[in-house]
Amino acid sequence: MAGWVRLKTGLTVIPGLLLALGAGAGARSGEQAGNRHATVVVFAAASLTDCLKEIATGYEKATGDKIVFNLAASSTLARQIRAGARADVFFSADEARMQALEDEGLIAKGTRRSRLSNSLVIVVAADRGAEVKSPQDLAGPKIKRLALADPQAVPAGVYAREYLRRVKLWSAIQPKVVPMENVRAALAAVEAGNVDAGIVYKTDVAISRKVRIAWEAPRQEGPLISYPMALLADAPQPQAGRRFLEHLSSGQAEAVFRKFGFIVLESSVP
């Protein structure tokens, strides 16, 4: 299993496209052969990493199915799916990526639902962070480098750019932006002291003791953040994928999402 990342929980994370292709091909043969337990390949936004690991651990123990994750920026995952990567479930951090795939016929009809929401926060280092009380402070001289997930492609960065444009700060802040591969990379840059501040999801802060929230976007003013999930049209394991989607809509999964700070958008299935 060279090249795969084995987590202490027993879950497996696929770091790249080629492994996703291989996992999908093998999984289809397992379902067609009528195997009792299936391997479900889930492409999910990086900001969902911790809650999905916990949900999957319990699900694996209860069902015997195996959940394999490819965790990255939603834009990266969408490109991989378009390129032919085989996966069962896509859990995106924005509606735009999901809609684009649905328009191309890559999403199974009737399976898409918006599950979660989040909020944007400005974070600084917990021990030596710059004094930031509002987005306007990001335009000041104390902030020279600001970490964002790529504002041209990655949902967290796109949401941040949209908000800063709305409050007429983007033109002043854009020269300071250090674009990162995904939102967790932006968080890591703040933790390491490589930037003065960052804009990430509120849920990302829950996993770090090295940063603190300096400001949170009010829900009535901030961008509308929505995490949709769906079965892929060419899922190698459609039945098992549907079962896992149903579990993600359960009250048990909702409790985990809330534990990690997500806002649940729909009523859960008991």
Each language-model region and where it sits:
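Bacterial N-terminal signal peptides
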Residues: 10-22
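Exported/periplasmic ABC-transporter solute-binding proteins
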Residues: 22-85, 92-95, 99-105, 111-270
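N-terminal secretory signal peptides that target proteins for export/translocation
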Residues: 1-6
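Intrinsically disordered/low-complexity terminal segments and short unstructured peptides
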Residues: 8-11, 62
